[in-house]
Amino acid sequence: MINKVLHGDCLELMKDIPNGSIDMILCDLPYGTTACKWDVIIAFDKLWQQYERIIKDNGAIVLTASEPFASYLRTSNIKIYKYDWIWEKERPTNALLANKQVLKYHEMICVFYKKQSVFNPILREREEKNKRNNKARPFTSNGYVNNVPNSQGMNQTGMNDFIKPKSILKFNMERGLHPTQKPVPLFEYLIKTYTNEGDLVLDNCAGSGTTGIACINTNRNYILIEKEQKYFDIINERIGNQTS
C-alpha cells in the first residue's frame, strides 16, 4: 500500500490501513463551500475514528481549512486540536465580492496530535542577515551555522541570527489541475516540519496529488486516496511524470 494511489471512498479504504502506521496525515478535506459534486463535508465522527486509529501517537494530523469549515473542524475534535498556521496567498479568492466584504487572502491549516508530534522547525535568517546576502546552512552539532570563510576556514553564525517559524506562511497559489489545488512548496514545508525522511504520509482526499509530489520531492513515502475518477487519473499521470 505504500507509495500507492487508491481509488475509492476514503472512509472504506482507510479501514485497510494498519493501526498506528501513519507518521502524518496531510489533507485538503472538502470544505462544503463550492457547487462541485465532490465538495461534501465528510462525517467527522467517522473520519476521526479512522484518523485516530491509524496515526502514530506522535504523528501530526494537518488539515487545510477555511471558515466556517475551519471552526467546525477544530471543534469536531477539540481534545487533540493544537494550533493553526495561516497560509497567506498572493491574491484574494473572493475578488468578485470586494464591494461586500473584505478580500480574503488566506486559508487556515489546522494541526492536531495526541502527543507531542515530530517538529522540525525550518529556521529563517533574520532580515538584516539577508540584506548582507548571508545564506543559511545546516546547523552543526554545537548549534552554529558555518557560512562565511574566515582566517580559520569558516565563520560561525549563532542561532540568534535565525528566527523560528512564524504562524503565517506565504506561498503563491497553483492552479490548473484542481479547483482547490494547493501549492507543492507549501506541502513540502509542512511535510518537512512534521516528518523525517522515510516517514509515511497519508492524504485521504488527494485531489490533484500535491501531497504525493511533495513526498517524492522530500524523500517521504505516501498513501493517496481519491474518490473522483478524473482526479485519480490526474494524480497517476502527475506522479508518473515526476518519477519517470
State where each predicted segment sits.
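Extreme N-terminal starter segment of soluble prokaryotic enzymes
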Residues: 1-5
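Mobile active-site "lid"/loop adjacent to the S-adenosyl-L-methionine
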Residues: 29-46, 169
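Class I S-adenosyl-L-methionine
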Residues: 17-19, 26, 36, 76-244
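Short strand-turn motif at the edge of the Rossmann-like AdoMet-binding core
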Residues: 29-30, 65-67, 205
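Conserved Class I SAM-dependent methyltransferase catalytic core
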Residues: 40-94, 107, 111-112
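Conserved SAM/SAH-binding loop
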Residues: 8-12
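Small/polar loops that bind or transfer phosphate-bearing groups
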Residues: 6, 64-65, 227
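A short beta-strand submotif of the Rossmann-like class I SAM-dependent methyltransferase core
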Residues: 7, 27
